[in-house]
Swiss-Prot record:
Pfam families the UniProt entry points to: YozE_SAM_like (PF06855)
Domain of life: Bacteria
Stated name of the protein: UPF0346 protein BCE_2336
Source organism of this protein record: Bacillus cereus (strain ATCC 10987 / NRS 248)
Family: Belongs to the UPF0346 family.
């Protein structure tokens, strides 16, 4: 069974050293409206852009690449 992007990102929460990806994971966890069941890049990217959760979408792109490599 494939992990959703949300499920993958939860392993980055509570990192020993905070970084942009761990901060994104925390923000996703705190956002009750985040599309938790999605595996779709466009859906998640659009959601993040509209929510203003990130200062730069390059953080999401980096996290997405890690997600794809881990699948």
């Amino acid at each position: 069974m494939k992990k959703t992007f949300y499920h993958y990102m939860m392993k980055h929460r509570a990192a020993l050293f905070s970084n942009e990806i761990s901060n994104l994971a925390e923000a996703m966890y705190d956002d009750l409206s985040f599309p938790k069941q999605s595996e779709d890049y466009d859906e998640i990217s659009s959601y993040l852009e509209l929510s203003g959760m990130l200062a730069s979408m390059s953080i999401f792109d980096e996290a997405w690449e890690l997600y794809i490599q881990d699948r």
